[in-house]
From Swiss-Prot:
Name of the protein in its database record: Endoribonuclease YbeY
Protein family: Belongs to the endoribonuclease YbeY family.
Originating organism: Vesicomyosocius okutanii subsp. Calyptogena okutanii (strain HA)
Record's function text: Single strand-specific metallo-endoribonuclease involved in late-stage 70S ribosome quality control and in maturation of the 3' terminus of the 16S rRNA.
Keywords, ordered alphabetically: Cytoplasm, Endonuclease, Hydrolase, Metal-binding, Nuclease, Ribosome biogenesis, rRNA processing, Zinc
Residues annotated to bind Zn(2+): H109, H113, H119
GO molecular function, one term: metalloendopeptidase activity
Top-level lineage group: Bacteria
Predominant localisation class: cytoplasm
Lineage start: Bacteria, Pseudomonadati, Pseudomonadota, Gammaproteobacteria, Candidatus Pseudothioglobaceae
Protein location: Cytoplasm
Record-listed E.C. numbers: 3.1.-.-
Length: 145
């Protein structure tokens, strides 16, 4: 199950589409039926989260927080993906992309982090980017890079 928490009440976000797509990502590339929370926030909130958890005092587009439940608790909760709508909008304008396509890309990117993918080294970054392209192509979004 994917839960969308739209903290900024942005009506331009199609929450049903976002939820449906991420549910498919989790099911196909992840751990079957798992719970994922997607939070849509403003710059101040994501900057605070970035400062507290990554020691970077600046806003960013997306952050992922894996669940911290003990392994003994058999809940299928992946964690949270936090997306800053304002940053995604700015980036989409700067990069000449559709806002919705860029939002989907950031949501997929954050979800893949929760599924164990990363981009710390070049090989992992290429693998993650290739998987993002594959997922986005399935929903009609061209190469985001």
């Amino acid at each position: 199950m994917v839960i969308i928490q739209n903290n900024i009440h942005d009506l331009s976000v199609n929450e049903d589409d976002l939820s449906c797509i991420l549910q498919k990502v989790v099911k196909e590339w992840g751990k079957g039926e798992s719970e994922l929370l997607v939070r849509l926030v403003d710059e101040a909130e994501i900057q605070n989260l970035n400062k507290v958890y990554r020691y970077k005092d600046e806003p960013t587009n997306v952050l992922s927080f894996p669940t911290d439940l003990p392994i003994e608790i058999d809940e299928k909760i992946l964690g949270d993906v936090v997306i800053c709508i304002q940053i995604v909008l700015k980036e989409s304008i700067e990069q000449h992309k559709s806002f919705n396509n860029h939002l989907m890309h950031m949501a997929v990117h954050g979800t893949l982090h929760l599924l164990g993918y990363d981009h710390i080294d070049t090989k992992d970054a290429q693998n993650m980017a290739n998987l993002e392209r594959k997922i986005l192509a399935k929903i009609g979004i061209n190469n985001p890079y």
